[in-house]
Amino acid sequence: MARLARIVRVFALLPLSGLALAAAEGAAPRTFYVEDIKAAMARHIEATVDAEGTFHLRDDVSGERLALQFVKIHDPVRRIDGDTYFACTDFRVLGAPGKLYDIDFWLEPEGDRLVVVDTKVHKEPRHSLLYGWYKQPRYTFVDDEVVYIYGDSPRP
């Protein structure tokens, strides 16, 4: 009878040993949500702008240094694969309210928060006599990978 009681206790405690093992190996990676992505973007933009609120960015295709003002984060922001998250934004050219850049940001976890790991100009402002300013895309996404439309690619 005592032996049976010991066997029952061992089997009863067996599932708990798995929990101890999981804790020893580290917790599962944190899942980040819309609010987390937007908060990370707000922190990044706030930390990056200068004293006048200007966001400076080197255009990875033209090499031009851009001086921009943040307008908005587009919905939806999302997780694109594994631990990579994505946000698309609009920035206005200083002194030209209708002239907008669409800037994309890739974020990854660093500890318990997301940080920006890559930034690209997705759409650049172009002017049309009929329509005024519009955003001309440089690339599209195929299976969440960047594919340049016109053969443009970033400069080293």
Name these PLM-found stretches.
Residues 114-156:
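C-terminal partner/receptor-binding element of secreted or periplasmic proteins
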Residues 24-84:
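N-terminal secretory signal peptides
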Residues 21-28, 152-156:
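Basic/polar N-terminal segments that are highly enriched at the extreme N-terminus
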Residues 97-123:
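A short, surface-exposed beta-strand/turn
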Residues 87-91:
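A short beta-strand signature
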Residues 9-20:
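Bacterial N-terminal signal peptides
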Residues 78-81, 92-104:
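Short, cysteine-centered beta-strand-loop-beta hairpins and adjacent loop/turn segments enriched
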